[in-house]
């Protein structure tokens, strides 16, 4: 199971790359919580997501969850997403640094946008040109900011995974 928080899903919807997320994780469903759904409803990108709620494949499913034992200083969407991912032992797509650090402390596998893109690069799902395009779209349409070293590594043809 793949659980997503608002930021990750919204970012890839804005650049019309949600299909890539489904493809990379070899899943037909991404699960979000009611709070994430409510946050997305307020976002300009919501209209782009509507088809995913009623699709037969590449579908976004909404689950009702009560956040439990998660710090109150995190947003409701983050809290519920962490709870759901922990309860279901699912991977969590989340780009909020503080929430991600907490989630990892409670043994939730968190995948942020740079990690996702590095995985796509390592597995040769995306080539350098495609990565440059996605990075450019994230920066221009989502105002996403990459650390300079991360961006250089993503678009470098000589990048070697750090665990080698």
Predicted regions mapped to residue ranges:
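PIN/NYN-family metal-dependent endoribonuclease catalytic core
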Residues: 3-4, 12-65
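Short active-site oxyanion
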Residues: 7-8, 27-29, 86-91
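A generic structural signal for short hydrophobic patches within well-formed alpha-helices
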Residues: 9, 37, 99-100, 117
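Acidic, PIN/NYN-like endoribonuclease modules and their adjacent C-terminal/linker elements
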Residues: 44, 100-164
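Acidic catalytic patch
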Residues: 56-73, 97, 149-150
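Acidic, metal-associated active-site segment
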Residues: 76-91, 98-99, 119, 137
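Short hydrophobic alpha-helical runs that function as membrane-insertion/retention elements
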Residues: 91-94, 112
């Amino acid at each position: 199971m793949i659980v997503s928080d608002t930021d990750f899903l919204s970012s890839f919807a804005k650049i019309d790359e949600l299909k890539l997320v489904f493809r990379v994780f070899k899943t037909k469903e991404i699960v979000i919580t009611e709070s994430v759904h409510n946050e997305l409803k307020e976002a300009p990108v919501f209209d782009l997501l509507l088809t995913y709620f009623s699709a037969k494949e590449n579908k976004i499913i909404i689950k009702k969850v009560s956040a439990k034992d998660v710090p109150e200083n995190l947003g409701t969407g983050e809290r519920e997403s962490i709870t759901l991912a922990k309860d279901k032992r699912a991977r969590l797509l989340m780009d909020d640094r503080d929430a991600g650090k907490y989630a990892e402390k409670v043994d939730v596998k968190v995948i942020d946008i740079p990690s996702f893109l590095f995985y796509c690069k390592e597995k040769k799902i995306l080539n350098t040109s495609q990565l440059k395009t996605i990075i450019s779209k994230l920066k221009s349409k989502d105002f996403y900011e990459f650390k300079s070293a991360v961006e250089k590594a993503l678009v470098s043809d000589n990048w070697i995974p750090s665990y080698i």
